A protein has these predicted regions:
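Small/polar glycine-rich anion-binding or flexible loop at a beta-alpha turn
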Residues: 203, 248-253
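Glycine-rich beta-strand-to-loop/alpha-helix junction loops that act as flexible
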Residues: 223-224, 244-250, 268-270
């Protein structure tokens, strides 16, 4: 996984690029009708229900736009919210509040939706030892925000990107000439380049799982698109030789059944690619 320093840098880049994209050479709507000296106050109003996420990110946005803005937080990230709740108040230059408004809302609406969906999966897994993982099926440019939201919702982050963990999937295996060749080439590459990266290998059937185990040195086996019966067989075959992960179209109706098969992790792209934004507003008070 990436370090905190790397993650913080990603957040800084997201904010800078989003403000560049949205503000350009100036918020001319505000500049045209609001004096530089005008002060204002606004509230973040919840118009939905679920798990709130992105409050700490909003603070960073306000600070980036204008370090003199003050935020009074009433509700923390990860809290359950309902219609009518006020998450925070922000106070400062009216122009600055308006400049930050859309980025704050866009981010918080999506992050809250992801956190809410993640919490549904987490609750469905309660009582098992299985953790829910996100994937790289994220919105380009804001992956750090979406993975942050998964953690706020109680989920666990998978690898951040292609560079912080090795995952040998079906195409890697086929292009390499088979499971054993892919794994052995990977081990040689890591040794040659002096890299310490964990290896995950996708298995499409029980025979490939045995091939992976025979090679050894794998951190986790991805049991992809298996039915329940074969998943249980795979878990029994793997035992404590490495960790296990189920994936492949797993949803709210099936996630508990896969957890009951004994896997350590379940990954779901739906946490980030299939959500409906939470309805939030930033209103002047």
């Amino acid at each position: 996984m990436i370090s905190k320093e790397q993650f913080d840098k990603e957040i800084e880049l997201i904010i800078a690029n989003a403000i560049r994209e949205d503000v350009g050479d100036g918020d001319h709507s505000s500049l045209a009708c609001i004096p530089d000296s005008a002060k204002g106050k606004a509230k973040l109003l919840v118009k939905d229900e679920g798990i709130i996420a992105g409050i700490e990110f909003a603070k960073q946005v306000f600070a980036y736009v204008d370090e003199n803005m003050k935020v009074d937080t009433l509700i923390e990230d990860g809290s359950k919210v309902k219609y009518g709740d006020i998450a925070f108040y922000v106070e400062g230059a009216s122009q600055s509040i308006l400049k930050a408004e859309r980025l704050v809302l866009n981010a918080m609406q999506r992050m809250s939706a992801i956190a809410t969906k993640t919490k549904v999966f987490v609750d469905l897994l309660e009582g098992t030892d299985t953790q829910i993982l996100d994937t790289r099926k994220t919105t380009p440019g804001i992956r750090a925000l979406e993975k942050w939201a998964v953690k706020i919702g109680g989920g666990t982050n998978h690898r951040f990107a292609l560079y912080d963990m090795i995952m040998l999937k079906d195409n890697h295996i086929d292009f390499s000439g088979g499971v054993a060749k892919a794994i052995n080439k990977t081990k040689a590459y890591l040794k040659e380049t002096n890299r310490d990266l964990k290896i995950i290998v996708e298995a499409r059937n029980l025979q490939e799982i045995q091939e992976i185990l025979d090679c050894g040195g794998v951190y986790r086996i991805l049991i992809d698109n298996f039915n329940y019966e074969d998943t249980r067989k795979a878990v029994a075959l793997i035992g404590d030789k490495c960790l296990t992960e189920s994936s492949g179209g797993i949803n709210e109706k099936t996630v508990r059944h896969y957890a009951d098969c004994g896997v350590d992790y379940i990954s779901s792209g739906a946490l980030t690619h299939s959500v409906y934004n939470m309805d939030l507003s930033l209103k002047a008070v």
